[in-house]
Amino acid sequence: MRFAAPLVRATLIKRYKRFMADVRFDDGTEVTAHVANSGAMLGTAEPGMEVWLSPASNPERKLKWNWELVTVDGHLVGVNTAHPNGIVAEAVAAGQVAELAGYDSIRREVKYGVNSRIDLLLEAEGRPKCWVEVKNVHLKRGDWAEFPDAVTVRGTKHLAELTDRVRAGERAVMVYLVQREDCAGFRPAADIDPVYARTLAQATRDGVEAICYTCRLAPDGIDLGAPLTMDLTERI
């Protein structure tokens, strides 16, 4: 995925109201940027951090900038949760996700379940449908990438709906996309949301597949990185 325009560096002043952040550009100008992330953003939204912004594509929008990346301990981390679906879709189409190869059709935002939309629906003649849910991961604790960074009732609901697809004889895959490169493995944040962690463990026992990939990040774009080891052991 390429950014439409080069990102501009700034310094984070503060994030507030979840979707807003005040930043200061290198020339001293201060603006309020849009934050496309409803999570807690633990460890990625501390005042003084170096951040990278993209200009809004709509010139009429009130907030003229989008917060895309943040530098944490010398590593770029993606914080815009609007990108993972597109990154994964591009990678699947290019044959870069071995676990999701061999499908002729990729559809996005297809209705299913109870008032839900699946991120990707993969189809091919003679094969069961493959329902793919993508989750953005940016939380790191120790050497582990973890999800979620806040309680996610919606995420737990998605796992139940994926399990229903497996019971219907179809394929369901949970993709955790880690928007950083400095993690040794992935695991659920069981202390933050024990219900989600337990539901994920049960879903995988019931046939839902779970895979995890990192991202390669740069100020000009974000690409799929390497697969990451997963530990889905129940801890709570």
From Swiss-Prot:
Pfam families to which the protein is assigned, alphabetical: SfsA, SfsA_N
Molecular function terms from GO: DNA binding
Superkingdom in the source lineage: Bacteria
PANTHER family (alphabetical): SUGAR FERMENTATION STIMULATION PROTEIN A
HAMAP family noted in UniProt: SfsA
Similarity field: Belongs to the SfsA family.
Name of the protein this chain belongs to: Sugar fermentation stimulation protein homolog
Organism name: Paramagnetospirillum magneticum (strain ATCC 700264 / AMB-1) (Magnetospirillum magneticum)
Protein encoded by which gene: sfsA
